[in-house]
Amino acid sequence: MEEKIKKKDYNKDIDNCDDELEGLDMSFQGIKVIGKEITLLVSLKQLILNNNDIETIPEDISNLIRLEVLDFSYNKIEKIPTELGRLINLKELYLNNNMIVEVPMELGTLYKLENFSILNNPLVHPYGIMSKDKSLLRFCRENNTNYKQPNDRVWIDTVLKIDQSLETYSFGTFNILCSLYASNLTYAPSWVINLECRKDILMQTFIAYNLDILCLQEVDINVFNTFYKEQLAQKLDYDGVILPKKSFDKVTDQPKKFHGIVTFWKKNKFKLIEQVSIDFFQKIINDKRFKYLSDIHTRIFQKTNVGLITIFETCNTNIIIIVANVHLYWNPEFNDIKILQTIIYLEEIEFLKEKYKHAHIVLQGDFNSLQNSHVYQYIINRKLPTNIFDPWDYGSLNNGVTHSLTLRNAYDGHDITFTNFTPSFKAVIDYIFYSKYLNLISIISPIEDEYTKTTIGLPNIHFPSDHILIGAKFQFKSSKK
């Protein structure tokens, strides 16, 4: 009778919990089973369940993604569910004084853990000898290969019938994650972020899709010069150009060049006729419109993003194509700078479109912008409202901006949920935009959402970057009159 009363009170207490409850202490309550009600309290940051009679941690514990402190010490737990590794915000985890024998490798993904205790458990070798410090977590992280095999990413037709009389050209964009940034990813195994390992997987990806024009971002300059340029020339008949991006050293505050954006093309299909390199910082501070606008000069300081525009003529049909490769600034606190960079870039493309009257346009890259952003809306809708730069003085731009290009998103209407996936971010921020006289006939399929439920972020054993490759195939008619 006493047990039933406790269970009744326990369920009643949970049912009456505030949806925004952040902490729950249920220690010393004689609890044997964790009810589903607890796993629905998604706002919890602390869950204390020590000194009970709990035997099983439910898989649904992974719902509590905001948890920072989790205490299961002094219970009767025999097994740690792999789903526990999805609680990536955990800073404290206490599993000591249970009956745990093994530790799942997925626990290594808990990269924010500061305090971890699993002492006084009958752990088998080698877990037991590593239980006193974080070496157990490192061991799990380094040996975690338990990733579900993703579905093959194949070409998906976007039209019912393809005109066989027209030439087809494939385009793609891929932020491949430079080694400088990869080395800071504490949630990934060292062998996953190792440059040599990632180079091999990246090469396999390039070869598998064999794109006619490939735009890359965050390409290590040294690796481009010593590896990619030569290897891709040999294996895919590519030629390529790189535009280095300056990065400021945090110690010396001096600019250095670690990585850049690259455009590769098939030498047997395209002839390069012009190249335009844009340093957004230099372009903006030297623009007469912004000469006396201190807000712009302050906001743009040390924002060293670049854009690379290459103009090609097709070898068989003499069609002109403007390929614009870009990597916009990342910080969401500087959305005004992203918009300004976009305005400047589209102005340059407009100028080239006037020069090459019948040219087609493919604009692709890492825009660091969501589909509901002003950057995306400006590209698609061709205009900006008058208040987007408030409270800063952007001169005439505060009155609204327009452009004349008609561009579409190649993945519009298709079920793509992300192009960038990390433990703290999962969204579409990379795009392929194309002009209206290009016929989109197929795209590379997205990664299925089911796969992302088994991992906390990229890169991993299957994907070498925190971004994914996206690609599209187009047909277009000759630009000759």
From Swiss-Prot:
This is Probable CCR4-Not complex 3'-5'-exoribonuclease subunit Ccr4. It holds the Pfam family Exo_endo_phos. Its EC number is 3.1.13.4. Its main location: cytoplasm. Acts as a catalytic component of the CCR4-NOT core complex, which in the nucleus seems to be a general transcription factor, and in the cytoplasm the major mRNA deadenylase involved in mRNA turnover. Ccr4 has 3'-5' RNase activity with a strong preference for polyadenylated substrates and also low exonuclease activity towards single-stranded DNA. It is found in: Cytoplasm; Nucleus. It catalyses: Exonucleolytic cleavage of poly(A) to 5'-AMP. Component of the CCR4-NOT core complex. Belongs to the CCR4/nocturin family. The gene is CCR4.
